[in-house]
From Swiss-Prot:
<dbReference type="GO" id="GO:0005737">
    <property type="term" value="C:cytoplasm"/>
</dbReference>
<comment type="function">
    <text>Modulates cytoplasmic dynein binding to an organelle, and plays a role in prometaphase chromosome alignment and spindle organization during mitosis.</text>
</comment>
<comment type="subunit">
    <text>Subunit of dynactin, a multiprotein complex associated with dynein.</text>
</comment>
<keyword id="KW-0472">Membrane</keyword>
<dbReference type="InterPro" id="IPR028133">
    <property type="entry name" value="Dynamitin"/>
</dbReference>
<keyword id="KW-0206">Cytoskeleton</keyword>
<feature type="coiled-coil region">
    <location>
        <begin position="99"/>
        <end position="125"/>
    </location>
</feature>
<comment type="similarity">
    <text>Belongs to the dynactin subunit 2 family.</text>
</comment>
<dbReference type="GO" id="GO:0016020">
    <property type="term" value="C:membrane"/>
</dbReference>
<feature type="coiled-coil region">
    <location>
        <begin position="256"/>
        <end position="282"/>
    </location>
</feature>
<feature type="coiled-coil region">
    <location>
        <begin position="355"/>
        <end position="387"/>
    </location>
</feature>
<dbReference type="GO" id="GO:0031982">
    <property type="term" value="C:vesicle"/>
</dbReference>
<dbReference type="GO" id="GO:0005874">
    <property type="term" value="C:microtubule"/>
</dbReference>
<dbReference type="GO" id="GO:0005813">
    <property type="term" value="C:centrosome"/>
</dbReference>
<keyword id="KW-0175">Coiled coil</keyword>
<protein>
    <recommendedName>
        <fullName>Dynactin subunit 2</fullName>
    </recommendedName>
</protein>
<keyword id="KW-0963">Cytoplasm</keyword>
Length: 387
């Protein structure tokens, strides 16, 4: 054995080689031929198409939140829920009929109301969350009532309900029978779809307002005595302002605010005690007391003016701006007068210069005329001499 690392190991065959080669297998023994299995009628052979299976389960996924346990609790389990009624919903890619949509909305509203009921039982919720859940529950219940009172045949027509149900013909016939019963009893009063739609919208709005009014009556009370007592306590006749006033007062009663108020009161008490000690130590000064009395009399005499004082101040501020404008106007007017005087002086000087220029021009013109006459006389003499 050439490799020394196996020299001292137990159970090693030192007289045999390290590499072992298997002999070649005959090709006749490795044929791909499969013998046909015997056909047995007791065995059911399923013909599964892979393409159809992929198309059917495309977009589906498994979730780990499904609960199939047998635990008992107030909250519904997340396993498959077997309903008492069988509703046929539209498949993937198919157009949903009005009947199927109505059933689907009812199922979704029932599930939502069950979830809200389960959240009500949760003690860890805050008051705001519970109030919001109550509001949502009221709105959903109102919408459910409106959906239950929906006259499907009257709104969309009996032909659409009967012909568009698809596989749910039995349910469509059942719904048509119920509508016929309502029609016989006089439940249907109008045949105009627009009128019925408006009535449904108005009934939903009225139901929502009634629910909100019921919540206000539960919180405040429907008796006039309680409302008048609330208005007298808060000093306002508006319910929103009264609630804001009460919430502001309730905010002051929080532990953090109480500590701050107590600290400020203690500081104020200490300051008042120190002021009282200083006044007791210094004693009473007659002159000081006399001045305080005079100031009190002055303040008392000016009490009627206090109410008019803001208007007087506003008027004085307005007059101040007016006085500023008047001062600026007077300054501008004085500058204008100065400029006008300088212009008048310049005009007078220009008149004097103009008079002198006119006199000089007249004298020069007279001299020119004399010279022209002399020149003409000489010209005539010269012409006579030439002749």
């Amino acid at each position: 054995m050439a490799d020394p690392k196996f020299q001292y190991l137990p159970y090693i065959a030192h007289d045999q080689p390290d590499v072992y080669e298997t002999p070649d297998v005959n090709e006749a023994e490795t044929s791909d031929y499969d013998e046909d299995e015997p056909v047995n009628d007791a065995i059911e052979r399923l013909h599964i198409s892979t393409k159809d299976s992929i198309g059917k389960f495309r977009g589906k996924y498994l979730t780990g939140e499904v609960d199939f346990s047998d635990g008992i609790g107030r909250k519904n389990r997340l396993g498959y829920d077997a309903r008492s009624l069988d509703y046929e919903l539209a498949g993937e890619g198919e157009r949903e009929t009005p009947l199927q949509r109505c059933h689907r909305l009812k199922c979704e509203m029932n599930e939502l109301m069950e979830e809200i009921e389960a959240s009500r039982a949760d003690t860890g919720r805050t008051a705001e969350e519970k109030a919001s859940h109550e509001t949502v529950f009221g709105v959903v219940s109102t919408a459910k009532k409106v959906l239950e009172s929906l006259k499907l045949e009257q709104v969309i027509g009996s032909e659409v309900v009967a012909g568009g149900a698809g596989g749910g013909d039995a349910e469509a016939k059942k719904l048509i029978a119920q509508i016929e019963e309502y029609r016989k009893t006089g439940a249907v009063s109008s045949s105009d779809p627009k009128v019925v739609a408006n009535e449904l919208v108005q009934s939903a709005r009225v139901a929502q307002l009634e629910h909100r009014l019921h919540q206000l009556e539960v919180a405040v009370g429907a008796k006039p005595e309680r409302i008048s007592r609330l208005a007298g306590t808060t000093g306002t006749g508006n319910l929103i302002e009264a609630v804001q006033n009460i919430s502001a007062k309730a905010a002051l009663l929080q532990p953090s605010q109480l500590d701050t108020i107590e600290q400020r009161l203690n500081n104020l008490l200490q300051q008042m005690n120190s002021i009282q000690e200083k006044s007791n130590a210094t004693g009473q000064d007659p002159n000081r007391e006399q001045k305080i009395l005079e100031l009190y009399e002055i303040a008392k005499s000016t009490e009627p003016i206090v109410q008019v004082l803001p208007d007087i101040l506003n008027r004085m501020l307005t007059l101040e701006s007016l006085h500023k404008y008047a001062t600026n106007f007077s300054k501008l007017f004085a500058e204008l007068e100065t400029t006008q005087a300088s212009i008048l002086n310049g005009v007078a000087a220009n008149k004097t210069l103009l008079t002198g220029v006119q006199e000089a021009f007249a004298q020069n013109l007279e001299n020119v005329n004399k010279e022209v006459k002399k020149l003409e006389e000489r010209m005539t003499k010269l012409q006579q001499m030439i002749k």
